[in-house]
Amino acid sequence: MKTYYQNHKDKENLAYAREMRRHMTPEESKLWFGFLKRYPIRFVRQKRIAGYIADFYCAKGKLIIEVDGIHHYTPKQREYDEERSKVLMDWGYAVFRVDNDWIKNNFYEVCKYIDEMVMERTGIDIRKL
């Protein structure tokens, strides 16, 4: 497995990532404030990784969560997202893409799935924390 070190693209994305943290979508806000902010294993928002900005990132599990809105379903954006996920997975990250509607309509299920992924990736039973 490769080790990733920040590069110049990450530094270029710094201001943009900061801006995205200030202006989250309603679904990102719901996931952050309703679940991830107080999660027993640390998550961060809008993390710069490999020249990209991940919506949410758990370093301990090398887990990236991407919240996909309607614009992610255009052919051009889908191609970009697939390439981006491939690059991140090549670096050893797990990428979980979740649709806005799933967060709106199945919030508990999304949270449960994140719990399962964190436990699988870290080996830590978060139910005991």
Language-model features: where?
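Nucleic-acid endo/exonuclease domains
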Residues: 1-129
